[in-house]
Structures are given as structure tokens and as C-alpha cells.
Amino acid sequence: MNNANFWQLYSEAVLTSLGFFWKALWAFILGYVISSAIQVFVTRERMKQTMGEAGKGSVALGTFFGFISSSCSFAALATTKSLFKKGAGFVPSLAFLLASTNLVVELGFIIAVFLGWQFVVGEYVGGLLLIIFMWLIVRFTRPTKLIRKVRKRLRDNEGEANEGEDVPDWKEKIQTLQGWKQVARKYFMEWMMVWKDVTIGFTVAGAIAVFVPRSFFQFLFIGSGQGGNPGFLAILENTIIGPVAAFFTFIGSMGNIPLASVLYANGVSFAGVIAFIFSDLVVFPVIRINAKYYGWKMAFYILGIFLAALVATAIVMHYGFSLFGLLPESTGQSQAETQRFAIDYTFWLNIAFLAVTGVLAWLRWGGKKEHKGGMHHGGGKKSIIERVLFWLAIVSYIWLAGGLIAAVIK
């Protein structure tokens, strides 16, 4: 690769990353507005009071509460721990965790933008299958003693929370200005939780789309880019390599979607892409946090459950879609690359939802000053993973700025 060619590819990679983000911006905003409103008006305390210990109803409630929660993996992990410690059953708690990272509204919008309706259906139907397979595996393995030991560990380490927490009526809250100010605070907290993952994910996706040759994907994912329907062993290999690839990206589900679109554009099977998307809970930061909460034995048990469930789900979804003739065919080009910055529906949707963000910013910071406590999230010293992500995001911004300069002067 000569020097001139590198600078051309560099600028192309950066423009691709920015094009990815521009294409997805309205979907991010819409998803986080809906998610923030639901989280404010349906509180964690209400979830704790409603979810039971076990049974179909409790699993269904855990799934529903996950669906209406934040898509941030780290927030979902903390909420799952809290629900489990408060008495929610192990399976309903894991159902909440899986739903909050695979069934949330905003994720569906982003998948629709980058991958199309088949993957949206695959995400939601597959997400439900993922929970069912997880439930079956737990019932088969019956880790009763381990669950009892872990719950005791949590209660001994953190103590019991107050049981008499007052749960506000959402019907009254939704009619108040203060309620919508809380929505605005939650909206910007959502962005604060995911900005690093999104920045890194979109930057890496643009770089991979331009710099990594198609032959690499064909080597990594057996049968990719060859057309037709690969054999079962190739599909199985794709569903195993998908989580491995996600493990090394170690970014959240929202940041992984543009990378999934790159895999799809390079001919990776439907099963492989679905497995990659479902793998945000089998990455190292999540394993480490689970170990911190529950101990390494439970962390590896959860890892094993999720890996087995997502491989089974991806295979079932692939052959189910194939049976009904619904398997999508890759065009060889990511949908987000086709027209990056045209004056089209994406442009007007972005303008409209940026205006919504402006209104939320006014609600958050306009008018009278409020106590700072509402915006604080997480608190304390940042973890090593958070610091690594922060500096990787800064490097990403430097990379993007350099590419824009290269695009202007080339």
C-alpha cells in the first residue's frame, strides 16, 4: 500500500464511520427518548415489587421489564444484581438481563437502519428464544446450591435495602413538568453511559469496512461470501466465531450493530451475524462484573448458559428463516454506506430529533438550578475497563479528526 493510497483509504474509513453514525442518529435519539420515559415512569422499585421468585409469570415479567429498560449492559448488570438480591428468582433475573440488552426498543431501531427488517424480527424473536433456552438450561442443570450461596453473598456484602420504598403513581408523574425533567436527565445519562461504546464501535466499523479485505471474512467465517446456503458445520462455526469476534471488540450492543452490518456486507451467514449481535453479554468486561457481584464460579456458569443459548438460538433462527424463505441475501454493501449525507428522509429525521434533544437539554439545564445528585451515575472511582474505553474513545476522536483533515486536503 503506497502512501497516497493509505491517505485515501484513511479518509474513506472516517467518512464511512461518520456516515454510519449520521444514518443511525435519529434512531438513537428516538430509542433513548422512549427508553428514558419508560424508565422514569416505570421505576426499579415497581419492578422489584412486581417480580416473583419463579414461574412463567415471573419470567414473563422479567422479560417485559428488561424490554422497557436501558440498553446499557453495565446498567442492566447492576439492575439485575439488585433484583436478584431483593428476592427475584434467578431465571427471571437473567430473563431481565437478556431482554434489557437484546429486546430494547432502541436496539430494534438501529438494527432496522443497518440490517433490515429480517434482522429486527431475528433480534426480537431470537431474544425470546434466547430466554427460553436459558430457562431450559438452568432447569436442566439445577444450580440450586450455587444460587442460594450467591444470594447470601450479596446480602452479606451489601446488606438489605429498605423494603418500604414509596412508589410514585406514573399517571400523576407523567402530567408534571418535574416528571419530564427527570426524563431529560435520564436521556442524557443514557448518552453518558454509551458514548464511549458508540464512538469506538462506529470508528472501528468504518475502519474494518474499508481496510479489511473480504478474503479475511471468508477465512474467518467458513462459507461466507460464497452464495447459496452453507452446510450445518459452516453455520455452527459461524455461530461460534460470532461470539469470539464480539469478545475481542468488548463494546456494547449499540456499538456492535455497525460492525454486524460490516459482517453482513461481507457475506457472513444470518446465523453468524445474529450470534455476533447476541454476544454483548459474553464479553470480558461483563464476565468480570458478574464475577465481582456473584463470584467467578457463578460468572462462568452464566457465561456457559449464555453461550449455549445464543448458539442454539442463532442456529434455530437461521434454519427457521430458511424454512420460510426469509433468509436475507447480502448485497455486498452495507445499507449505511449507500448515501452518506444526502438530503433525504434521514436528514429530516435527524433535524427533527436533534430539535427534540434541544428541548430535552432545555428541560435538563434551563431554568432554575437543581441539585447535582440527579445526574450522577455510577459514582466512585472509574473501573479499569471504563478508563480503557475512555482513552480508546479519545483515540477514536483523534482518528476521526485526522481522517476529516485528510479528506479535505486530498
Annotate each PLM feature.
Residues 42, 48, 184-265, 270, ...:
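Transmembrane helical segments that form the transport core of multi-pass membrane transport proteins
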Residues 53, 58, 120-165, 289-373:
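Juxtamembrane and boundary regions of transmembrane helices in multi-pass small-molecule transporters
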Residues 32-37, 128-139, 201-209, 242-246, ...:
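Hydrophobic core segments of alpha-helical transmembrane domains in multi-pass membrane transport
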Residues 1-17, 410:
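Short, strongly hydrophobic alpha-helical membrane anchors
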Residues 7-10, 14, 57, 61, ...:
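Alpha-helical membrane-protein architecture signal
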Residues 67-125, 213-306:
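Membrane-interfacial helix-loop connectors
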Residues 23, 27, 31, 35, ...:
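Alpha-helical transmembrane segments in multi-pass membrane proteins
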Residues 157-184, 369-385:
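Membrane-interfacial, low-structure loops and terminal tails that flank and connect transmembrane helices
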